[in-house]
Amino acid sequence: GCALNSLANNQILINNYFEKIFIPYAPGDAGGSIGSALITFRKKNKDSFANLTTPFIGSAYSNEDIEKIINNDQRLKQFKIKYYKNRLELNNLIAKKIYNNNVVGFFNSRMEFGARALGNRSILANPCSPNIKEIINKKIKRRESFRPFAPSILFEEKNNWFRNSHYNPYMSC
């Protein structure tokens, strides 16, 4: 779990203590299960090597699975299902919804494994809305008010928002 200290990881990175640094997508205690599985795999399969190159190793659901869940839950029947093959059209719709202070649940492909939501299972909302934190914490997540939120910005815009910004795909430093 020591690699989950993102503040320490960031200091290691920006102070150039090492030529290269890699912090995995599951740097906390949960990552130990991945390490154990890889060691066991390696012991049993001496001629091959398992390499997990993506954090998106969690469960996945088909469109039919999702429709069934929504149609069988009274609380979810109010939601309409619409499929988008054009990603730009979907992105524009999401941007408009967020701009109009709607909260958007984003569900895409496989679930990420690790301490951070990396985009495949996300709650998206307008950060300019003064009461959005309370809405998400109380009404949607039903959690304590002190829980943190993470901003999402385009990679190309990172230097406009952060000092010492760097490529950090797993938000671990």
Show the residue positions of the predicted features.
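Flexible beta->alpha loop and helix N-cap segments adjacent to enzyme active/binding sites
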Residues: 9-173
